Design a protein with these regions (language model features):
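Amphipathic alpha-helical linker/stalk segments
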Residues: 48, 62-92, 130, 134-140
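Helix-turn-helix
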Residues: 13-17, 21, 25-59, 63
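Short acidic/histidine-centered micro-motifs embedded in hydrophobic/aromatic stretches
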Residues: 67, 110-114, 157, 161
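Amphipathic alpha-helical segments used for helix-helix packing
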Residues: 102-124, 168-176
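C-terminal peripheral helix-coil segments that are non-catalytic and often amphipathic
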Residues: 2-3, 134-143, 147-148, 161-203
Length: 203
């Protein structure tokens, strides 16, 4: 059973380096496969410290999501505040989301694990941490999209594409996987997102 409690309170007791290490573990293995002992070993502390002082695996997980989700919203804020209801406004907002995910691949990866039924001990992760930026983006881009385009589905298409690209890159016709750190592939992917936005925009 997952440990419950406010992630903010737990996070206040957890050192930043522990949250950083735990984020990497959760992104690589998923919540269900990470144990208290794995966190302790990776952080160089005793398992009793993780279970006691840090509140256990569940609270560490919530604290990781709290921090990354807050950072994501803070990062999106300038583009959201300066949003213009046109194609270029959408491009700037999408770029901002993509840039955050490229710089912080742990969060997209954690959510992809979640989409495959990870961390089911926590039924409310989406409204608490997952959907707020997506709702924001959908509401903003809805002002710019053509009337025939569904804002929610369009936004989710962007999110799915960005998370999948950040996690796995693309596999070309030659069968070679090219990751998101390949600058050439990254440029192609960004251009493709821009094309989607411009074609879906009303103006």
């Amino acid at each position: 059973m997952a440990e419950r409690g406010a992630p903010e309170a737990a996070g206040a007791r957890i050192p930043d380096q522990v949250l950083t290490t735990a984020a990497r573990l959760f992104s690589e293995l998923g919540y269900d496969e990470v144990t208290t002992q794995i966190i302790a070993d990776a952080c160089g502390v005793d398992a009793a410290v993780v279970a006691g002082e840090y509140g256990g695996k569940g609270r560490v997980f919530l604290a990781v999501l709290e921090r990354l989700s807050r950072e994501r919203m803070d990062y999106l804020s300038p583009a959201a505040s300066a949003f213009t209801p046109d194609a270029e406004g959408m491009v700037r907002l999408i770029d901002r989301y993509l840039d955050y995910c490229l710089d912080h691949p742990e969060l997209p990866s954690i959510w992809m694990h979640r989409w495959m039924s990870d961390a089911t001990d926590f039924p409310d992760l989406e409204p608490r941490y997952g959907t707020p930026p997506i709702i924001l983006m959908s509401e903003l881009m809805g002002e710019a999209l053509d009337d025939e385009v569904d804002p929610d589905l369009f936004t989710w298409q962007i999110v799915w594409a960005v998370h999948s690209f950040t996690r796995g890159g693309i596999v070309g016709a030659d069968g070679v996987r090219r990751r998101a750190d390949d600058l050439g592939v990254r440029k192609r992917f960004r251009r493709s997102l821009h094309q989607m936005a411009r074609r879906a925009a009303a103006r």
